[in-house]
Swiss-Prot record:
Residues 6-193 form the RNase H type-2 domain. Belongs to the RNase HII family. One of its GO terms (molecular function) is RNA binding. HAMAP family: RNase_HII_B. InterPro entries: RNase_HII, RNase_HII/HIII, RNase_HII/HIII_dom, RNaseH-like_sf, RNaseH_sf. Its cofactor is Mn(2+); Mg(2+). It catalyses: Endonucleolytic cleavage to 5'-phosphomonoester. This is Ribonuclease HII. A divalent metal cation binds at D12, E13, D104. It comes from Methylobacillus flagellatus (strain ATCC 51484 / DSM 6875 / VKM B-1610 / KT). One of its GO terms (cellular component) is cytoplasm. Endonuclease that specifically degrades the RNA of RNA-DNA hybrids. Pfam families: RNase_HII.
Length: 193
């Protein structure tokens, strides 16, 4: 019997659907000695609850990292590849090497560690739920910062997602530097379709 400690790393991304901003990924190794109550898929939590849990995760996890791929990278390699690259970057930055990586969804990044995709993993696996919370809060924070740079797009409100409000502002002001030019609504505004 092996004495090797099993270290599960949960990985998830945030921001595949928005028309603007980076896609974020987080990798989290939770400490079994410090369980964090209330972990759940970030999409089911209020912003306030996500922010509180993100602080707890950062304080109590054995290791955590957050990485991203820019809108420009998304346009160059497509959103799936950019999501996987952000995940790989997050895993590569870990200070502790996990024994297994569990990823939300079907696709796993190309890494040397055994990895498994779990559909709806953010609602089934605590480590993935923790990663989903860190990725979502980091991305939301970035979009609030982008709101300060580009107030005419109201990014703090819709976080770059293709809401009717965002689409109207996009049509009114055109695309800015952080809009994803490979996405159909942005292409339409730029006259590329």
């Amino acid at each position: 019997m092996s004495n090797e400690r099993v270290l599960i790393c949960g990985v998830d991304e945030a921001g595949r659907g928005p028309l603007a901003g980076a896609v974020y990924a987080a990798a989290v190794i939770l400490d079994p000695q410090h369980p964090i109550p209330g972990l759940a898929d970030s999409k089911t939590l209020s912003e306030k609850k996500r922010d509180m849990l993100a602080i707890e995760i950062k304080q109590h996890a054995l290791a955590w990292t957050i990485a991203s791929c820019s809108a420009e990278e998304i346009d160059e390699i497509n959103i799936l590849q950019a999501s996987l690259l952000a995940m790989k970057r997050a895993i590569d930055q870990l200070t502790i090497m996990p024994t297994q990586v569990l990823v939300d969804g079907l696709h796993c990044p190309g890494i040397a560690i055994p990895a498994q995709g779990i559909v709806k993993g953010d609602s089934k696996v605590q480590e993935i739920a923790a990663a989903s919370i860190l990725a979502k809060t980091a991305r939301d924070h970035e979009m609030v910062e982008m709101h300060a740079r580009y107030p005419q797009y109201d990014f703090a409100k819709h976080k770059g997602y293709p809401t009717a409000h965002h689409l109207r502002l996009l049509a009114e002001h055109g695309a800015c530097e952080i809009h994803r030019r490979s996405y159909a609504p942005v292409k339409k505004v730029l006259g590329l379709v």
